[in-house]
Amino acid sequence: MRLVPLVWAYIEMTTMRIISKGNSDRGLEVDLSTKLGQLELPAPSLSASGCAASGKELSQFMNLADIGAIVTKSILLEPRSGRATPRMAETPSGMLNSIGLQGPGIDQFIEDDLKWLEKNQVRTIVSIAGNNAEEFGRIAGKLRKVGENVVGIEVNISCPNVANRGLVFACQPESAHEVISIVRRTIGGSYPIFAKLSPDVTDIVSIAKAVVDAGASGVSVINTLLGMVIDTQLMKPALAGVTGGLSGPAIRPVSVRA
């Protein structure tokens, strides 16, 4: 797993704070605070969902309380074992992953991971996923009474490596609207909700409008692109699941265009 970009961002932020502190007597200050909809963060750097699980992996490299927030790996209602291995394959400008939403389920996640994050005072955005709209609502309901360190929810309606492609809600405005509406009704008020959009659509703007109309505070753009890598030694797909989600520098121009 490549941690260089996030670690480098942390180094840059730390350096800016040191410079600011060292020159405070000269009236020089650096304000890194960022506002995402209703959500106010002290710094603009967030981890991408999936890259750091619940954040424990990154804690050996940095103080997680120094970045804007940790975005957790997407959590389902029930535990899931995920896909067979191999699950990851490197590409020239990124990597493919085919994890299959492996996770402990929301109850165990709250008991173990969220307690650890709260203990370490880590601002957290919990990413949630579901097999149907009702499941999204049930997970959101369980997050209503968690600690104050949970500052928002990312609603993953676009994971491209789930075996049944029929469950990708982000491909249609109507289904995307339905999921966000249920989450908003369940969580209530102006609590920050961000819809994670899929690049595998012909009109991402219509999807974005639908989720905002349904109550989303903003959108997370973009999820991985579906791809495949061939193992030229074995002459077969490198991933056990055949296809996987492409992430990394290769998809940045696609995200910017969206």
Predicted regions and their residues:
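N-terminal capping/small domains of soluble enzymes
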Residues: 11-124, 129-131
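N-terminal active-site wall of soluble small-molecule enzyme domains
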Residues: 34, 38, 135, 202-204
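Alpha/beta enzyme core
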Residues: 137-258
